Amino acid sequence: MGITGAMKIAHLAETLGLDVELHACGPAHRHCMAAIRNTNYYELALVGPKCRNPLPHIYTCGYSDQLDCIDSEGYVPVPIGPGLGVTYDWDYIDHHRIALHEFV
């Protein structure tokens, strides 16, 4: 579905007076939530005070979806910068890749 599809669904829900929630975490989700008026909750996957997020650390810019990314008022920052506002650790990603599909 991607960002465009998520935004279309959010706008449709808004016209019907409904809220929409994005059930995952990540830079794209934060950007979408910042642009959607009818969303309320940012989901952090499988985290708790003694349970770290199992998603690998693939960012080199300090981006995190751990509990410590939530500020004192309960907000998470939206990454700034080109694209989604994050930089990726391509060495880590390449080292842990299990397949490569190239589409020409």
Residue ranges with predicted function:
Residues 1-75, 79:
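Shared catalytic-loop signature of beta/alpha-barrel
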